[in-house]
């Protein structure tokens, strides 16, 4: 456990970054009356779901959990970026919410800044949580929250396009069979695969299944395995299996390309399930294959329920009740269904599949998934991701070979993470 003095120093540094971000974006206010220092009986919860108003099932759940714990819950929903900034500022003012729900890559940032308690400190039971999902919130062997659920990536396919090309999606089990399928699709006069390779975190998110699926590691971007993954993508563009638009595609615009009906495959996430039903064509979903076969580890998305540090540690007893209520099996099932997430425990995953067998492939993908900040990368991850997306942008645009692009990326990442 880092010393209090060092934690406060890191917190001040993190707040400085947050303040700079606020000045560039939307501006921040201290909102000194809305944090943890509230009257006895009032507990605050901050979440990244501003789309849910007080009449929503989500807010009703928060209220019910408070009532069951004998307290009144005061809830505020923020946009994800704004939430991180406000959490850092509130911690500096000793005014943190009692429960903070944040995107999983943010957990390491807040934990490193000394903002969060460990699950051991608050006595939150994480024994039933899938270890690969819990890992996104583990730093230095300690857990700093519990996942509310997870989303990840897989391959959607257009059955009509594959049928016309004579491709059985069940035969797509590795990179060789996937590329062979794309060849047949192109020969049949259709489009192969669309994805997002934009120069942002979205692009890295979409590249990681191929990178990890080759056996590469984020601590060595220019390994032979990493080069193989980037070569797969560049070869697809060279051969016309993927469009040049992937360089600027977000996950949303990539989906729009697939929804137009001409592409055989699209790499996208669980959050597109509702939209898939609206496409007007028969679709299916298969896991993203690893190079040698099997399901590739895809990155996890989704939020963690965390407990910020409070000067009055007696509050943790109620905080534990709130967290336990929000993540209980019945409540997790309802919340994950609303958010199009896969649950974080085997028991709830089995219930999800029993209710909707279309989720089977997503459960398989989540079981193989991996947190971007896992392997104790923590706050180093963003310093690795940016050189990585710079590398695949360079290689896909033809300004550098995959090997040279990743060599440059490794040099940059190594210097940034010393």
Located regions from the model:
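Conserved C-terminal helix/tail region of periplasmic/extracytoplasmic solute-binding proteins
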Residues: 2, 163-164, 368-418
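Conserved N-terminal structural module of periplasmic/extracytoplasmic solute-binding proteins
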Residues: 2-107, 292, 314, 318, ...
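Extracytoplasmic "Venus flytrap"/periplasmic binding protein-like
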Residues: 66-131, 164-166, 264-265, 275-276, ...
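Hinge/lid segment of periplasmic solute-binding proteins
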Residues: 104-152, 179-180, 187, 206, ...
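Periplasmic solute-binding protein
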Residues: 110-115, 133-170, 198-218, 300-308, ...
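Extracytoplasmic/periplasmic substrate-recognition and gating elements
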Residues: 165, 238-242, 277-339
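Glycine-centered hinge/linker elements that transmit conformational signals in sensory
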Residues: 182-186, 219-247
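Long, aromatic- and glycine/proline-rich binding clefts that accommodate carbohydrate-like moieties
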Residues: 337-387
């Amino acid at each position: 456990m880092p010393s209090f003095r060092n934690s406060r120093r890191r917190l001040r540094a993190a707040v400085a970054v947050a303040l700079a971000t606020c000045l560039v974006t939307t501006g921040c206010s201290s909102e000194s009356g809305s944090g943890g220092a509230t009257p006895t009986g009032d507990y605050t919860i901050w979440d990244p779901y501003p789309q849910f108003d007080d009449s929503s099932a989500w807010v009703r759940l928060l209220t019910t959990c408070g009532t069951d714990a004998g307290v009144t819950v005061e809830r505020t929903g923020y946009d994800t970026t704004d939430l991180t900034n406000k959490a850092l500022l509130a911690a500096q003012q000793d005014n943190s919410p009692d429960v903070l729900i944040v995107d999983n890559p943010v957990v390491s940032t807040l934990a490193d800044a000394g903002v969060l308690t460990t699950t051991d400190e608050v006595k939150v039971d994480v024994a039933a949580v899938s270890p690969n999902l819990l890992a996104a919130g583990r730093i230095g062997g300690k857990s700093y929250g519990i996942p509310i659920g997870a989303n990840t990536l897989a391959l959607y396919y257009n059955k009509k396009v594959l049928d016309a090309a004579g491709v059985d999606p069940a035969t797509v089990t590795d990179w060789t069979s996937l590329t062979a399928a794309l060849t047949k699709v192109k020969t049949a006069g259709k489009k192969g695969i669309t994805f997002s390779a934009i120069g942002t975190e979205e692009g890295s998110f979409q590249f990681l299944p191929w990178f990890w699926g080759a056996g590469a590691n984020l601590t060595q971007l220019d390994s032979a395995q990493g080069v193989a993954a980037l070569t797969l993508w560049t070869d697809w563009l060279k051969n016309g299996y993927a469009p040049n638009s992937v360089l600027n595609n977000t996950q949303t615009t990539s989906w729009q390309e697939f929804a137009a009906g001409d592409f055989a495959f699209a790499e996208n996430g669980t959050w597109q399930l509702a939209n898939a039903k609206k496409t007007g064509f028969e679709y299916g979903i298969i896991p993203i294959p690893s190079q040698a076969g099997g399901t590739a580890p895809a990155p996890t998305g989704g939020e963690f329920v965390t407990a910020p540090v409070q000067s009055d540690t007696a509050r943790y007893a109620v905080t534990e009740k709130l967290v336990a209520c929000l993540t209980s099996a019945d409540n997790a099932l309802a919340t994950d269904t609303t958010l199009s997430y896969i649950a974080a425990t085997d028991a709830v995953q089995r219930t999800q599949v029993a209710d909707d067998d279309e989720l089977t492939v997503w459960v398989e993908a989540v079981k193989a998934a991996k947190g971007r900040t896992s392997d104790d990368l923590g706050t180093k991850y963003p310093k690795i991701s940016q050189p990585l997306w710079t590398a695949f942008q360079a290689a896909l645009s033809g300004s550098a070979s995959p090997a040279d692009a990743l060599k440059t990326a490794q040099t940059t990442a190594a210097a940034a993470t010393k």
